[in-house]
Amino acid sequence: MNRLPARISRVEISERRNMKTLVVTKTGSLEIREVAVPEYNECQALVKMVCCGICNGTDAKLIHHTFKGFGEDAYPLMLGHEAVGQVVETGGRVSSYKKGDYVLLPFVSEVPDDEELKSGWGGFSEYGVIDDAAAYPEGEAPECAYAQSVLPKSVDPVDATMIITLREVLSAIKRFGMSRGESVTVFGCGPV
């Protein structure tokens, strides 16, 4: 399990709680397993997952063992990264999220030490964790904290799973230096 900086402590949970999660096995099969609800620290919030999209570029490749950088030792793993959830508990330093907020990109990035699973972001789990970048000491927030945010009340959580895909498309446009009015050629007819 990841170690926290000395100034950040875990939220103490009186008893172990369990949840269900979708797992990709070493053979590429899917199964539902019962695992511990993720622990969180004082700079994070516990989130009840509401919905999660299926990403052809990530989830399908993880299922078929073709995702770059995920070798056989990465399995079994919890699947899903295009998730939206609702905050149910917050750590003591959290100020950007409150109970009841719908949030983008909650993950299960840490798996309890007694579980054999690895994380494929865990969006198809019953619970996940979101980081509050503002709660961490300067320079110590995980990178994902800057992509996680409160969902505006006017946006349906199911529709919001597409925001994550849109963000990836906008990122590609930025990386390739495309500007408004330019012509581009798109090869293939993938989902994005």
Where are these regions (language model features)?
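Cytochrome P450 core scaffold surrounding the K-helix E-X-X-R motif
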Residues: 57-63
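NAD(P)H dinucleotide-binding glycine-rich loop of Rossmann-like/cofactor-binding domains
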Residues: 110-184
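Glycine-rich beta-strand-centered segment in the early N-terminal region that forms part
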Residues: 38-53, 66-109, 120-122
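Glycine-rich NAD(P) Rossmann-fold beta1-alpha1 loop
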Residues: 190-191
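Residues located in well-ordered beta-strands
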Residues: 20, 31, 36, 48, ...
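Short, Lys/Arg-enriched N-terminal segments with co-localized hydrophobic residues
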Residues: 7-18
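Residues that mark the start of a beta-strand
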Residues: 20, 44-46, 183
